[in-house]
Curated annotation (Swiss-Prot):
The keyword Membrane does not apply. The keyword Acyltransferase applies. This is Orcinol synthase. It comes from Rhododendron dauricum (Azalea daurica). The active site is at 164, 322, 355. Mainly expressed in young leaves, and barely in mature leaves and twigs. InterPro entries: Chalcone/stilbene_synt_C, Chalcone/stilbene_synt_N, Chalcone/stilbene_synthase_AS, Polyketide_synthase_type-III, Thiolase-like. It comes from the Eukaryota. Keywords: Acyltransferase, Transferase.
Length: 412
């Protein structure tokens, strides 16, 4: 493919300089989760529904997930256990839990990213944070300033309620901030924790079974990256002097970023915050909407800006795709004609963590980087120079981020 040569402008491109992730301590094996879920919600009498849920979990391609809500929490807060037509008011309990725990998990991921970055925290100039839940004023961004010991004059951007595409949104915003504020370093965070989304199973007669689908795939997690524009003339050899790394080490370059709404897809996925918590809707058509429209509506537009001529070989890219679920990944594979290994990083994250909403693509980004190094690939993009990050969620809104890898030989 013929790519626009922009090496002379690389100083102005935003780069991902470090990545950190974190999960709650409670790990649930997928094979055990149906028995656990129906037991703690006192729903073992729903035999047919439990069998249906077991089949969902078996087909999910997930092996384990991490969640804050455990049996002890449910025993202390029985109002969270009800499902279907028996849901009761429990929003206060759920929000209080999220307001308390989301900042802690986000701070853990941020600390890992800053440790890898190796620079003084005083260099952080901007903070971008997203969480679908846990709304409070002042927000989690305010709490993170205190928890991380950041300068109180750090410029903060707080985003709520975006859902699964939020991981792409924060990167797009961070790119604009880094490239338009010389010398800036942007701490970017997504943290998703689902106390508001935990409900007991509905009855078979109840029409809304989407909650059951969510319980088969959703997990909690936080991802953090640091974004800035590094002058390549300064080198990237990671020399450490007096405990401070002299040079930063870019992992990926954020070449461009786009947001698109897929046509006629508003009802494919969404949610409403009710007195009983978050009630979400997951249409069976979601996988078809995403796989059927994403190439024409998103990929073609995004890569037309970076590629001079028509481009058809999607296998010449590395792929960082939101692991929304097995059906979406399978259909995207088939629609784009991708080789089997192309969505390896996304499938690995789905297997080990489930769908962590907006945080997921940051986990996939980390998996891509680590897997490339472990397999001795020549670049952080599995040996490929160019790649794409896709986040999608309610709308259906799609964030398309064009990335450029760096040679793994530069990483020490």
């Amino acid at each position: 493919m013929a790519l626009v040569n922009h090496r002379e402008n690389v100083k102005g491109r935003a780069q991902i300089l470090a990545i950190g992730t974190a999960n709650p301590k409670n790990c649930f094996r997928q094979v055990d989760y149906p028995d656990y879920y129906f037991r703690v919600t006192k729903s073992d009498h729903l035999i047919d529904l439990k069998a249906k849920f077991k089949r969902m979990c078996e087909k999910s391609m997930i092996e384990k997930r991490y969640m804050h809500v455990n049996e002890e929490i449910l025993e202390q807060n029985p109002s969270m256990n009800h499902g279907g037509e028996k849901m009761v008011s429990s929003l206060d309990v759920r929000l209080d839990m999220e307001i308390m725990e989301i900042p802690k998990l986000a701070a853990e991921a941020a600390t890992k990213a800053m440790d890898e970055w190796g620079q003084p925290k005083s260099r952080i100039t901007h903070l971008v944070f997203h969480s679908t839940l846990g709304t409070v004023m002042p927000g989690v961004d305010y709490e993170l300033i205190k928890l991380l010991g950041l300068n109180p004059s750090v410029k903060r951007f707080m985003l709520y309620h975006l859902g699964c595409y939020g991981g792409g949104t924060v990167l797009r915003l961070a790119k604009d901030l880094a490239e338009n504020n010389p010398g800036s370093r942007v701490l970017v965070l997504c943290c998703e924790m689902m106390p508001s989304g935990f409900h007991g199973p509905p009855s078979l007669q109840h029409a809304h079974l989407d909650i059951l689908t969510g319980h088969a795939i959703f997990g909690d997690g936080a991802g953090a990256v640091i974004v800035g524009c590094v002058d390549p003339s300064g080198g990237t050899n990671g020399v450490v002097e007096r405990g401070v790394r002299r040079y930063e080490q870019p992992l990926f370059e954020i070449h461009s970023a786009y947001q698109t709404v897929l046509p006629d897809s508003k009802d494919a996925v969404g949610g409403r915050l009710r007195e009983a918590g978050l009630i979400y809707y997951l249409s069976k058509r979601l996988s078809n909407d995403v796989s059927g429209k994403i190439d024409e509506c998103c990929l073609a537009e995004a890569f037309s800006a970076a590629i001079k001529d028509n481009f058809e070989d999607w296998n010449s890219l590395f792929w960082i795709v939101h692991p929304a679920g097995r059906p979406i990944l399978d259909k995207l594979d088939a629609k784009l004609g991708l080789n089997k290994e192309k969505l390896r990083a996304s499938r690995n994250v789905l297997r080990d963590y489930g769908n962590m909403w907006s945080s997921s693509v940051l986990f996939v980004l980390d998996e891509m980087r680590k897997g490339s190094i472990a397999q001795r690939k020549t670049t952080t993009g599995e040996g490929f120079e160019w790649g794409v990050l896709l986040g999608f969620g309610p709308g259906v809104t799609v964030e398309t981020v064009v990335l450029r890898s760096v040679p793994t030989a530069k990483l020490k």
